Design a protein with these regions (language model features):
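Histidine-anchored nucleotide/phosphate-binding helix
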Residues: 46-54
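Short, charged beta->alpha transition segments
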Residues: 16-22, 50
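Short acidic alpha-helical/loop segments enriched in Asp/Glu that coordinate divalent cations
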Residues: 11-13, 47
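Conserved catalytic cores of phosphodiester-cleaving nucleases, focusing on short active-site segments
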Residues: 1-11, 28-40
Length: 147
């Protein structure tokens, strides 16, 4: 298991504590997607760094947008090479046709402090963490939990 301070872990919500205890063998990879309608030159850095911040609780982080202006793509490539965030061009009409423009680089460690903050602020994320814990305890996937 990752080296975690007992004092710090004592401040986490129970969902995070329970997940960390069973996550040590990493049979899964956690993914984070920050979805925007449009990325252009004026909002590219803000959207990107929001993705960086919100994806530290995942092994892979992606910035997803329905529209990405060509002048923003160069900046995204530069930022992605430094921070490992991937970029997906979303086809809203046919999501299976969406394109990975820049693949994300895998992070080996999860920022559990950020995961704890997200779990305390967002019940959907807390439920997601609970599903991961259940998977690790039972090695079974209940498909209805993930839809």
């Amino acid at each position: 298991m990752e080296d975690l301070s007992h004092d710090l872990m004592g401040q986490w919500c129970n969902a995070i504590k329970d997940c960390v205890k069973v996550y040590s063998d990493k049979r899964t990879r956690l993914w984070s997607f920050e979805v925007k309608v449009k990325i252009n030159r004026s909002n590219v850095r803000e959207a990107f760094f929001q993705t960086v911040s919100n994806s530290s609780s995942a092994n892979f982080g992606y910035l997803v947008a329905k529209e990405i202006n060509s002048d923003a793509v160069k900046e995204l490539r530069i930022l992605s090479s430094s921070h490992g965030i991937g970029v997906i061009l979303l086809d809203a009409e046919n999501p299976l046709e969406s394109q990975i423009i820049i693949p994300a680089r895998e992070r080996n460690n999860i920022d559990w402090n950020t995961a704890n903050r997200l779990a305390e602020e967002n019940m959907d994320f807390k439920q997601y963490i609970d599903h991961i814990r259940v998977f690790y305890q039972s090695y079974k996937i209940n498909k209805s939990d993930w839809i």
